[in-house]
Swiss-Prot record:
Keyword Transit peptide attached: yes
Name by which UniProt lists this protein: Pentatricopeptide repeat-containing protein 1, mitochondrial
GO molecular function: mRNA binding
Deleted gene: phenotype: Impairs growth on galactose.
UniProt lineage: Eukaryota, Fungi, Dikarya, Ascomycota, Taphrinomycotina
Keyword annotations of the record: Mitochondrion, Repeat, Transit peptide
Domain of life, source organism: Eukaryota
Protein purpose: Mitochondrial RNA-binding protein required for the stability of the cox2 and cox3 mRNAs.
Underlying gene: ppr1
PPR repeats: 257-288, 294-328
Amino acid sequence: MLKRAHYVALHVTLNHNGLSYQRVFSCLTQFPMLRHSSTAAKNNVSMISKFQAPEDKFFPSFSLKSMPKQSSHMSASLLNSLNTSMKKSFSRKKYREAVSLFRKNLWKYEESWIRNQDFIDCCIIACSAYEKLCQPLRIKKTFIILSQLCPKLPAELCRVFLSYATGCVNYGHNVALTCFENSPKELIDYNYWLSWLSFSKSSPVVLWLTFTRISSAGLSPNAETFEILLVAFASQKNFWFFEKTYDLFMQSKLTWRPFTYRVLIESFMKFGNFEEAEKLAYSYVKNKIDSLSSDVFFSAILKFYAVGGDFQGFKKLLSFMTDYNVNFSVSTLNQLLRLNLYHAMDEKISTFSSEHITKLIEQQIKPDLESMLIISEYLNEYKPSPKMRELINWLYSNFHLPKTVSLHFLREVQSLVFRYPLLHSKIHLAISTLKDSGCDWNVGLSYLNWLFVNKRITEAINFFYTITINAGTRPPNELFDVFISNLLKFTSAETTSSAIRKVQSKYPSMCGSSPAIKLILFSKSFSVLQSTSEKIEQLLVSFQRNPSAYSKSFTLALAEWLFSRRLFQSALLYSFKVSDVDDSHFSFRSQILICWCYYRLNDFKSLIQHTNNLLQSNNASLLRRLAATLYRIQIRENNGYKRVLLDRLRKKAILRAFPSRTLNRTEKVKLYNEDAKFRSIFSRVLLHQSHLGNVIS
């Protein structure tokens, strides 16, 4: 996705008065979808934008009402002053002030504004300010408002919103498709659209149907179009669509670009077609398609040899590259490093790779981030020899991050630097790029985990507040989950309670509408709760005073936690509070939990009765879950009588879940005989029930 964003940034050149709009693609965070409603009268332009989420105070509701028409001179002067003020605020990095000016004046909109260059500049500056504030969905909202005010936007605005739509995965297919279809045909680039579908992980069918629209639009696919499709289908491991695209590409007889060879070589390697990939690599060099042949075309093949330990194949290919004067780069250095590290016990391989690494270093080829990651992964698994340690230290001392790097490189540094001890000295760079290029939630999650692991609790709490409450952005559930889980693990119950109440006061929907804090709602927290029972008990005591605390979700989560603590009797009591048989997810989980509680309490009679009650249900989903649960219990049961009973109940649940399976007369007779046998076994089990140890009674 980030590679595609960088590609779009290179191909969309927008610059106005020194303001760069190519960084619109750093806003790849996830925000809640905003709901809106709009009304438009025929002669009275009116629009009401109402946000349902209570935390969305940054973009308040407003309406465009009919205003007395101003003269063209007054309108032009207003737009000119607005444009000047917004530029001044943007240049001073007061982005909130810039968008506030834009919102306050948007309700004065007139039809003549859309043709005014000052108004177009104001829209572009507002979008850039939202990008700086890491609010890509506000840009989407701006596009919706402007498209409602003027169905046909100017080409310059269309181009801006097209670049945002292809650069941000948060737009969703519907809005991005609307942005494409409402734009002038001369601006629509189907390669943009295919690339956006590719990095948004659309299904192969959607990609193929979009590809067929190119022919229906009267256009001919070029080599870039086929490259995008081949990369997408190879990454999804869909060989059928890949082969079909490759056949069409061969039939089209288009001119192959150097990048086409690279795409095909890497794709064939992903599908395991090593011979075809090697054949393409050799033909690329022998035909001298590119006078400066790069070693990146051989990188995937060299990696295959290095990981597999095929020393002869690696040596042969490296000799071929030397004979044809292929330019070596850090790509070959990384594969030699991988061969050296993971086959260091073989003296022959170690000597060969060390010699070539020394030659490449003498050619002023310095290690990059991938080199450091290869070394870090090796150090996490193995203890290097003194000779290897000397080589690693030398490589690390020559590793320097460049001053000017691409967006993709910055994201790599941010997401990986926190996980490898070797890269911890580069954390200051990762934090600075995190602020400059926009908050990526995945990076924030990695950094938050790293702070908690290193016992920097205060910094972790402040960092969470900085990127959520102070920035005015709602955190995703996963980030909130990790934050709460680590607070439960490392801090006191009072600190956890106050932190959750602070987040809930700002974003009530994070913890539910109930004022009680539903701490155990998040599934990932259960592994942490096993070691923090005292803190949870203290929190439960403080929250039990609120009668609204016991919603279905909270009560069921509490029952599951009690079951994990082997408190089966208490878990059974809480499970019965949400045991109403309906189609809800909580009901299914509670019914299954009751079965497990009876089994762990060794109350086989109650388990059979509860199972028979569930068999009266017509809900196929519940019956399928019941059958799976009975099978798991049957595997754990050692008593032969009980195993036969459980197997019989499981078969009944399956038959009830799939009523379309009709039985012939022979099967009905067999089922009747099995019922008689079932009743006999059940009566025998009840006779020995007193010896089974009924805990509840």
